[in-house]
Structure formats: C-alpha cells, structure tokens
Amino acid sequence: MSVESFTPTALEFTPGAAHKVKTLVSEEGNDRLKLRVFVTGGGCSGFQYGFTFDEDVAEDDTIVEREGVALVVDPMSFQYLAGAEVDYQEGLEGSRFVIKNPNATTTCGCGSSFSI
C-alpha cells in the first residue's frame, strides 16, 4: 500500500469533504476508518456512485489524504473518477457527499447516477 500525492486534476478531495469525514470518523471513535468512493453499474444513467466507510485498503487502491483523513478508491472505479472532485454539501435537500465528474456525459437529477 502506498500513499501518493495527486495534482488537483487527478482526484480532488475537498476540505469540506475531508472535514466531514474527520467529524464522522471521530464520532465513530475509530481512526482507522477511511471514506471509500466507488462506481457500480446501475442507476437511471448507467453508473452510480457509492460511499462507505472502510478500515481496509487493498494494495492497488488509490489513497488521497487531506486533513489527516483518507479517501480510498479501487482501480476499477478510479478510471471513472479521474479528474473528479469529491465534496460535501448541505442544503434544502439534505446533507451528502457529492461528486463533480468531468468524465460524465449525462447525469441524473439526483446527482448519484451518470453515464460516460
């Protein structure tokens, strides 16, 4: 497992998202937790984003660290997320992690589904 530094065009983990991850990890009392972002088939546009907390990191995972917390992406998902921004937003619709993905040609109105 290696931690690599990426330019903002590779995968951006915003300060807002990192702060929220740090808060949630602190609430759980388990500093081994990392935010895992993944892409699966499904949703109304063909692919959908998923978020989970994970203690484990595979050897070929990509890890992006900010503010002492980590975002983890598996190699299959990374090919769809290269150049994307992972952020955390609060609004009238509620609070959630969101992905701004320049690779997506169409997105669903909910923002969790996309196509390439």
Swiss-Prot record:
<dbReference type="GO" id="GO:0051537">
    <property type="term" value="F:2 iron, 2 sulfur cluster binding"/>
</dbReference>
<dbReference type="InterPro" id="IPR000361">
    <property type="entry name" value="FeS_biogenesis"/>
</dbReference>
<dbReference type="InterPro" id="IPR017870">
    <property type="entry name" value="FeS_cluster_insertion_CS"/>
</dbReference>
<dbReference type="Pfam" id="PF01521">
    <property type="entry name" value="Fe-S_biosyn"/>
</dbReference>
<feature type="binding site">
    <location>
        <position position="110"/>
    </location>
    <ligand>
        <name>iron-sulfur cluster</name>
    </ligand>
</feature>
<feature type="binding site">
    <location>
        <position position="108"/>
    </location>
    <ligand>
        <name>iron-sulfur cluster</name>
    </ligand>
</feature>
<dbReference type="InterPro" id="IPR035903">
    <property type="entry name" value="HesB-like_dom_sf"/>
</dbReference>
<keyword id="KW-0479">Metal-binding</keyword>
<dbReference type="InterPro" id="IPR016092">
    <property type="entry name" value="FeS_cluster_insertion"/>
</dbReference>
<dbReference type="GO" id="GO:0005506">
    <property type="term" value="F:iron ion binding"/>
</dbReference>
<comment type="similarity">
    <text>Belongs to the HesB/IscA family.</text>
</comment>
<dbReference type="InterPro" id="IPR023063">
    <property type="entry name" value="FeS_cluster_insertion_RrpA"/>
</dbReference>
<feature type="binding site">
    <location>
        <position position="44"/>
    </location>
    <ligand>
        <name>iron-sulfur cluster</name>
    </ligand>
</feature>
<protein>
    <recommendedName>
        <fullName>Iron-sulfur cluster insertion protein ErpA</fullName>
    </recommendedName>
</protein>
<dbReference type="GO" id="GO:0051539">
    <property type="term" value="F:4 iron, 4 sulfur cluster binding"/>
</dbReference>
<dbReference type="GO" id="GO:0016226">
    <property type="term" value="P:iron-sulfur cluster assembly"/>
</dbReference>
<keyword id="KW-0408">Iron</keyword>
<comment type="function">
    <text>Required for insertion of 4Fe-4S clusters for at least IspG.</text>
</comment>
<dbReference type="GO" id="GO:0005829">
    <property type="term" value="C:cytosol"/>
</dbReference>
<keyword id="KW-0411">Iron-sulfur</keyword>
<comment type="subunit">
    <text>Homodimer.</text>
</comment>
